[in-house]
From Swiss-Prot:
Gene responsible for this protein: murC
Protein name stated in the entry: UDP-N-acetylmuramate--L-alanine ligase
EC number: 6.3.2.8
Task of the protein: Cell wall formation.
Gene3D superfamilies, A to Z: Mur ligase, C-terminal domain (3.90.190.20), Mur-like, catalytic domain (3.40.1190.10), NAD(P)-binding Rossmann-like Domain (3.40.50.720)
Key word Cell division present: yes
UniProt-annotated location(s): Cytoplasm
Domain of life: Bacteria
GO molecular function, one term: UDP-N-acetylmuramate-L-alanine ligase activity
Lineage start: Bacteria, Pseudomonadati, Pseudomonadota, Alphaproteobacteria, Rickettsiales
Reactions the enzyme catalyzes: UDP-N-acetyl-alpha-D-muramate + L-alanine + ATP = UDP-N-acetyl-alpha-D-muramoyl-L-alanine + ADP + phosphate + H(+)
Biological process annotations from GO: cell division; cell wall organization; peptidoglycan biosynthetic process; regulation of cell shape
Length: 485
């Protein structure tokens, strides 16, 4: 960023163009650069929440990708999701415009800061948001670049006034190992992004580098409830690691006396830090979001807060100020006294965690769990097909749509229908159904919803838009529901 800082002082401000600026990771970096005073623009195929937000700040957005979009730009930023055949990439190469990977731009933003990088297969976005809340409660105003919309801020990125930067570190293409972090958090490690890594051991090796690349004065925070993370922690001796968990009796930070409902979780915490005599107990910590997995996410934030001496009051206040993250067990509506939940879960482990939370709540309300799942990417379904067959046990009624391609080509034999067929054949679920059209979910809700039920609409595709339009869709059929968000 030093070169860019010099060029920013020139009378002619050079332009940074983002291809795919509507993506959650790209939009966050674009917003930070804009707030730092750089001239930013970008393109995306369709308008969405992020493009509208950036436009409201005065950032120029092109809908569609075309060579003329980069006529007067000095730098082009891309993510690994952008096809190399994109016309703007081809034009940038032709004109020798520097092309910068998203992760490299993030690294430049982090290089001169004291940085917290949050990675792991699941829970990154919520953990990043929780860490940010604790920093703010401690009187530190961090810059934050997140992978989801933070409800407190109605954005996924914002510029702070302190020397701290908190960022979600995407592990999908191994670029996260090059991020210059001071503190590294690993929430869990599961088989994911194997289309890039090819095998699980290579993915685990990337997480090892994520820790060992820390400076000697930094530290890692790791969840040892997860057996792969525990083994990784046991194998690393050259960096300080603070561990946390619920089931791990030897973890440095442990949650116990846990109680959760539809809106919150309350628990106590035992802290036994390495090289520190004695044990500290923090009683009755409350986070305004349900689920065991979110308690684990909060323990990661507590570990950072304890290591940086935030104090118990700041930790509790920070959690009290947390308002959740968009699409993380978000209640969007009520129909016939049933709660309709929008959730980003798209990996088998995420699905299990989300449905376990829903089951716990439904049992307390004498209700049932109705899961409507939209698979995301043919490659993910192919690599994890057996895991997908086993992850819906906590759903009383299950509906699976066809696969949201996300730009991928179909793979023979890998469909939503084939998943339902295998689940039924192997008796993993006795009420698994295929939804040929997502719009058919309206009928599912009308026919099945009852008082106390939890209707969970899950996936990383367009099922979220569907969930947030349920009031209109129900009204078109002569029914009405209460919209929550």
């Amino acid at each position: 960023m030093l070169l860019l800082e010099l060029k920013k002082t020139n009378q002619t401000l050079e332009t940074i163009h983002f291809i795919g600026i509507g993506g959650v990771g790209m939009s966050g970096i674009a917003e930070i650069l804009h707030n730092l005073g750089y001239k930013v623009q970008g393109s995306d195929l369709v308008e969405n929440y992020n493009t509208k937000r950036l436009e409201s700040y005065g950032i120029k957005i092109f809908l569609g990708h075309a060579e003329q979009n980069i006529t007067n730009v000095s730098y082009v930023v891309i993510s690994s999701a952008i096809n190399p055949k994109n016309p703007e990439i081809k034009e940038a190469l032709e004109r020798k415009i520097p092309i910068i990977r998203r992760a490299d731009m993030l690294a430049e933003l982090m290089r001169l800061k004291c940085s917290v990088a949050v990675s792991g297969s699941h829970g990154k976005t919520t953990t990043t948001s929780l860490v940010a809340c604790l920093f703010e409660a401690a009187g530190l105003c961090p810059t934050v670049i997140n992978g989801g919309i933070i409800n407190n801020k109605s954005t996924n990125a914002y510029l702070g006034s302190s020397n701290y930067l908190i960022a979600e570190a995407d592990e999908s293409d191994a670029t996260f190992i090059h991020i210059p972090s001071t503190i590294a958090i690993i929430t869990n490690i599961d088989p994911e992004h194997l289309d890039y890594y090819k095998d699980f051991e290579t993915l685990i090796g990337a997480f090892r580098s994520f820790i060992t690349n820390l400076p000697f004065y930094g530290f890692a925070v790791c969840c040892t409830d997860h057996k792969i993370v525990r083994k990784l922690v046991d194998d690393i001796t050259e960096r300080k690691i603070v561990t946390y968990g619920i089931d791990s009796e030897d973890a440095h930070i442990i949650a116990f006396n846990i109680n959760t409902d539809i809106a919150s979780s309350t628990f106590d915490v035992k802290i036994s830090l390495p090289n520190v005599l004695g044990t500290t107990i923090i009683e009755k910590i409350t986070i305004p979001t349900p689920g065991r997995h979110n308690i684990l996410n909060s323990l990661a934030a507590i570990a950072v807060g304890i290591e940086l001496d935030f104090g118990i009051k700041a930790i509790k206040n920070g959690f009290n100020n947390f308002k959740g993250v968009k699409r993380r067990f978000t209640k969007v509506a009520e129909y016939n006294k049933a709660s309709i939940i929008d959730d980003y879960a798209h990996h088998p482990e995420e699905i299990k965690a989300t449905l376990a939370t829903a089951k716990n709540i439904a049992n307390k309300q004498n209700g049932k769990v109705i899961a409507i799942f939209q698979p995301h990417r043919y490659s993910r379904m192919q690599y994890l097909f057996d895991d997908f067959m086993l992850c819906f046990a906590d759903a009383d009624i299950l509906y699976i749509t066809d696969i949201y391609a996300a730009g991928e080509n179909p793979i023979e034999g890998i469909t939503g229908q084939s998943l339902v067929d295998k689940i039924t054949k192997h008796k993993h679920h006795d009420k698994a159904n295929f939804l040929a059209e997502l719009d058919d979910a309206v009928g599912v809700i009308i026919d099945n919803a009852a008082s106390g039920d939890m209707i969970i609409m899950m996936g990383a595709g367009n099922i979220s838009s569907f969930a947030n339009e349920l009031d209109r869709r129900l009204l078109s059929r002569g029914f009405s529901c209460h919209t929550v968000v």
